[in-house]
């Protein structure tokens, strides 16, 4: 099994998978009589159909045992999905490019610094949320509407990957 190298999360490195949601280096302007700095349009919510709605949820995630064997990835073909850490803790992101199925050799791993969120573009393969802390909370922006919006792909044993945040 191949061990994934964990890369720092940057806008450039993550661009083919979605948006990095962060204030560092982002455009902003003042509002509310100059008392508030607005970092505008950090990501775009994607939905497949006009009747789909963007919704906001909170996911409370428990840490998984590490090192982790990456056995599966999922994708959301009908909408984007954003994860914004609420407690400021670093977390891990495992992704693969859009396609009929994820290619094990193209899977990449990233580490958020805890002040960065991610917005997965429609159809991007990704692992379910991976917190490093025992328990963590994430603001999630995704799509509500008709139709199945979650496909799962399970790797064969030869395709499985190892994720070790302590490497």
From Swiss-Prot:
- Could you tell me one molecular function GO term of this UniProt entry? ureidoglycolate hydrolase activity
- EC number(s) reported in the record: 4.3.2.3
The pathway it acts in is:
Nitrogen metabolism; (S)-allantoin degradation
Tell me where on the tree of life, at the top rank, the source sits.
Bacteria
The Gene Ontology biological process annotation of the record reads: allantoin catabolic process; purine nucleobase catabolic process
Pfam families assigned to the protein according to its UniProt record, in alphabetical order: Ureidogly_lyase
Per its Swiss-Prot or TrEMBL entry, what cofactor is needed?
A: Ni(2+)
Recorded catalytic reaction(s): these are: (S)-ureidoglycolate = urea + glyoxylate
UniProt keywords, alphabetically: Lyase, Purine metabolism
Its biological function?
Answer: Catalyzes the catabolism of the allantoin degradation intermediate (S)-ureidoglycolate, generating urea and glyoxylate. Involved in the utilization of allantoin as nitrogen source.
State the family named in the UniProt similarity comment for this chain: Belongs to the ureidoglycolate lyase family.
Task: Please report the name of this protein according to its UniProt entry.
Answer: Ureidoglycolate lyase
Species annotation: Pseudomonas putida (strain ATCC 47054 / DSM 6125 / CFBP 8728 / NCIMB 11950 / KT2440)
């Amino acid at each position: 099994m191949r061990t994934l190298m964990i890369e720092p999360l940057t806008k450039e490195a993550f661009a083919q998978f979605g948006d990095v949601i962060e204030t560092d280096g982002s455009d902003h302007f003042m509002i509310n009589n100059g008392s508030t700095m607005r970092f505008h349009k950090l990501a775009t919510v994607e939905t497949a159909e006009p009747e789909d709605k963007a919704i906001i949820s909170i996911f409370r995630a428990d840490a998984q045992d590490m090192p982790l064997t990456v056995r599966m990835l999922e994708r959301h073909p009908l909408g984007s999905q954003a994860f914004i850490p609420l407690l400021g803790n670093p977390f891990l992101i495992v992704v693969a490019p859009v396609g009929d199925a994820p290619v094990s050799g193209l899977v990449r791993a990233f580490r958020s610094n805890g002040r960065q969120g991610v917005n997965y573009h429609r159809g991007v393969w990704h692992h379910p949320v991976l917190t490093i802390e025992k328990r963590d909370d994430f603001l999630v922006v995704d799509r509500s509407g008709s139709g199945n919006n979650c496909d799962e792909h399970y790797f064969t044993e030869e395709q499985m990957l190892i994720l070790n945040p302590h490497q």
